[in-house]
């Protein structure tokens, strides 16, 4: 039987940590974190009423009281929060956030309002704090990437198995702690956790989106969307403007040779055709999509070559044949970031001309702005390491109210799409 006194002590310890974080009392917070002998990382305790972690609390405490944010004439101010007597508070918060991240605070833990600490910082206009959380997320993903134990960067990142994720986090903490420099004469581990542990899977839990499940899934082709058997949106018509601009960026003149990996609804391939390529190769892995392509006569279009299968199996053959392209587009479904990174680190160099360009559908983390910002930096660094420069063009995303009716979950919720255009480094 649980000891009620112990339970009260644990709750009081949690509240002490949260209070010290919200008051930006780094000295007390450091003592509490180091002295805590409860199970789990005290930097990630949760307030049961708000779901706040210490990181949430430290950032949320920077929000001005309403009466402090209203001018004497009663007009609400809309300027930068940091210019209204908040400088000292924000500076204290910076030091608190720094400490918490060093102690292993989870950068994208969710509160009961479905906000991460970075979401709160962005909502309050706290740019410096937001950037700190973004950088922490980048460090976490890059480290887990190098450990070959990171989760896939996809729409499912918030819902990975909790036990597996915790093992990844523990391994990352141990690895990172061994290389952390001392600061202020105290050795502290830097952030490596990526998400809060998800609840255990139940018998009726939603199935994971994996490549093998998708490729064995029945598909539903509708006028404005393509869905798998679990009602996941594989591709939707609202992406058309993005695809049109991508095709024009990749194929500025007629007569170029292009490869598209992932046909889906055929949106980008339709726009590619409008650019009059001399050769248009398409790799498509799903048998139902291939059948739909043939039904629509894609195999009869001039210059079009359909490769049935996964790019992992098709591309080595094209390399062996010496087939080269001036442009490549990548837009697969249910593949992991590890697959994508293998594509541009191992495969692109074998089929892309020296002056060629390539792009991809940039939807990683698009369910919230901070995830999108983190994953953009991650892929940018990995592209650089693979020998590619990348330029980004921001495109307005149309209002998507009503678009998600009948779809398992929205995979896009931010206002701007960042279109990548990659080429070999000079």
Curated annotation (Swiss-Prot):
InterPro entries: Ankyrin_rpt-contain_sf (IPR036770), Arginine_N-MeTrfase_2 (IPR017408), RMT2/GAMT_Mtase (IPR051038), RMT2_dom (IPR026480), SAM-dependent_MTases_sf (IPR029063)
UniProt-listed GO biological process terms: methylation
Biased composition (Polar residues): 73-88
Family to which this protein belongs: Belongs to the class I-like SAM-binding methyltransferase superfamily. RMT2 methyltransferase family.
This protein's GO CC annotations: cytoplasm; nucleus
Keywords: Cytoplasm, Methyltransferase, Nucleus, S-adenosyl-L-methionine, Transferase
Binding-site residues, S-adenosyl-L-methionine: 214, 243, 263-268, 284-286, 311-312, 331
Domain RMT2 residues, every copy: 207-426
Organism placement in taxonomy: Eukaryota, Fungi, Dikarya, Ascomycota, Pezizomycotina
PROSITE patterns, A to Z: SAM_RMT2 (PS51559)
Locations listed in the record: Cytoplasm; Nucleus
Sequence segments annotated as region (Disordered): 65-88, 155-175
Biased composition (Acidic residues): 155-168
Intrachain S-S bonds: none
GO function terms (MF aspect): protein arginine N5-methyltransferase activity
Assembly information from the UniProt record: Monomer.
Name this protein carries in UniProt: Protein arginine N-methyltransferase 2
């Amino acid at each position: 039987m649980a000891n009620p006194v112990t339970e009260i002590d644990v709750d009081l310890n949690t509240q002490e940590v949260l209070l010290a974080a919200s008051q930006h009392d780094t000295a007390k917070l450091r003592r509490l974190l180091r002295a805590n002998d409860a199970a789990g990382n005290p930097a990630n305790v949760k307030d049961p009423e708000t779901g706040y972690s210490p990181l949430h609390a430290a950032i949320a405490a920077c929000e001005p009281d309403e009466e402090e944010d209203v001018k004497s004439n009663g007009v609400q101010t809309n300027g930068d929060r940091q210019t209204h007597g908040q400088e000292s508070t924000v500076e204290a918060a910076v030091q608190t956030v720094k400490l918490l991240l060093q102690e292993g605070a989870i950068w994208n833990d969710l509160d009961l309002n479905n906000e991460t600490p970075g979401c709160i910082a962005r909502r309050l206009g706290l740019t410096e704090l937001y950037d700190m959380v973004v950088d922490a997320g980048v460090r976490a993903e890059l480290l887990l990437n190098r450990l070959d134990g990171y989760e896939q960067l996809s729409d499912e990142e918030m819902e990975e198995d909790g036990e597996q994720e915790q093992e990844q986090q523990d391994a990352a903490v141990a690895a990172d702690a061994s290389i952390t420099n001392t600061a202020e004469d105290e050795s502290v581990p830097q952030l490596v956790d990526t998400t809060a542990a998800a609840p255990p899977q139940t018998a009726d839990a939603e199935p994971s989106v994996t490549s093998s499940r998708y490729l064995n899934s029945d598909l539903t082709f509708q006028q404005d969307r393509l869905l798998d058997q679990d009602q996941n949106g594989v591709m939707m018509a609202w992406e058309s403007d993005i695809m049109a601009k991508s095709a024009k960026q990749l194929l500025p003149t007629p007569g170029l040779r292009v490869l598209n990996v992932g046909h889906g609804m055929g949106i980008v391939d339709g726009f590619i055709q409008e650019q009059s390529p001399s050769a248009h190769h398409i790799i498509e892995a799903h048998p139902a999509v291939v059948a739909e392509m043939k039904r629509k006569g894609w195999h009869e279009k001039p210059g079009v070559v359909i490769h049935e299968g996964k790019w992992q199996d098709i591309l080595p053959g094209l390399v062996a044949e010496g087939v080269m392209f001036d442009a490549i587009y990548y837009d697969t479904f249910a593949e992991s970031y590890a697959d994508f990174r293998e594509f541009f680190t191992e495969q692109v160099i074998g089929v892309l001309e020296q002056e060629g360009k390539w792009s991809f559908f940039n939807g990683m983390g698009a369910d919230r702005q901070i995830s999108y910002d983190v994953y953009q930096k991650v892929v940018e660094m990995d592209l650089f390491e693979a020998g590619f420069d990348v330029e980004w063009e921001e495109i307005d995303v149309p209002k998507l109210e009503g678009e998600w009716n009948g779809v398992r979950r929205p995979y896009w919720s931010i206002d701007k799409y960042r279109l990548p255009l990659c080429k070999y480094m000079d």
